[in-house]
Amino acid sequence: MMFIGRQEELAELDNLYSTDKFQCVIIYGRRRVGKTTLISEFVKGKEALFFAATENNSDSMREEFCNRMYQSLNAPSIGTLDSWQSVFQFIAKETRDRRLVLVIDEFPYLAKADKEIKSVLQNVIDHYLKNTKLFFILCGSQVSFMEKEVLGYNSPLYGRRTAQIKLEPFSFFDSREFFPKYDIEKQIQAYCMLGGIPLYLSQFDDNDSLEDNIKGKILRKYSYLYEEPKNLLKQELREPMNYNAIIEAIATGATTLNNIVGKSKLPSDHCSKYLKTLMELLLVEREIPVGEPKSSRRGIYRIQDAFFKFWYRFVFPNTSELELGMVDDIFNEEILPELPKNYGQGFELVCHQHFLRELKEHRLPFRFSHIGRWWGNNPVMRRQEEIDLFAAGKDGAYIGECKWRNEKVDKTILDNLVCKGQQLFPAIDNKVYVLYSKSGFTSEVKRIAKKDNSLILYGLEDF
């Protein structure tokens, strides 16, 4: 399969490699995000030793590592070395004048099997490796572990890295490259269902319609995506049943702790613990109105992974019927009527990403420091209001609406947005209004935008 995206990360790795000096690079990110694919692309044409740690004991892993080491280095075997210290000293001798990429994937497994490995690495980096030509990559999927136990200040490895790369899911603009045969609308729809995880994106075939992909690649019980969320949770967690209940509760509309407790039927303290774990896995996030402190009581829980959100909304509650092969029934009755709502929510994220790109390309009248959604009380109308896009900086704020509908955006929508902006943010002098529309704008709105610098319009053709 063609290598897609990650050009910045690949360029950074190539730049570090070209120094011909010792490097220790930490690469981490949630499962399925493409860490191994990035590393595999990077090591093409380079001498490399790749070792993936497993949930095994340290001695068994050291034996496997030594076997791979002798084979990769084309060195005569002297058997399994008696310690990891000896292993890395051997590598240090081999790489004094030899550029080698050493990759230890799933490092948290090794660190949990051998409590001393981090201190061993600290010692060998300081006394043996730093004057070699070794290009050392430590890779892991347990994000919280990598941040605390590898990159954290209290880790023995603190200060030993020369670079770190946290791989994030693809934005829409990288994800769309998986579907070059789809038009922009279908590309957005696919992204709203699959999110930015490369492995999920690669399952869809843009030679087929979206409907056929949903049925064949998600709802069909033999497909990879049909059981992916369940399998991933089993791999990461000991009590997947309780986590299933929480994720399903959020996917079907519960956003506060009280609502999640009510829907999942789990005790409040258990829910809090499980939510913390899901946030560490980057599957759930706590969203707060943009500009408010993290401690804000108005925070809500939402599923961070778009595919998990889709799966727990439509697949998980309909498993019994899907096991019977009732794919068409579930699609037509349960999914098809709800897809516009799903696309509308996903479109907001795509608009945020587009607006950030506009900032990066210097196409906006002023910079902003944070972007997101805003919700809260309207003191004038005495009701709750939502703003799809709110981006503020020292020179003003952008206030936006993102419309995924078949009708053109008209002046009524514009007037409502301006009214909300004036009522909700009276202290902000410089307000620029932003409208995103799937179906374009009426001629009246276009005329206003031509004359008014405080209004910006974006259609799908601008993506």
Description of each model-found segment:
Residues 1-333:
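Phosphate-binding site recognition
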Residues 299-463:
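A cross-kingdom feature that marks ATP-driven nucleic-acid transaction machinery
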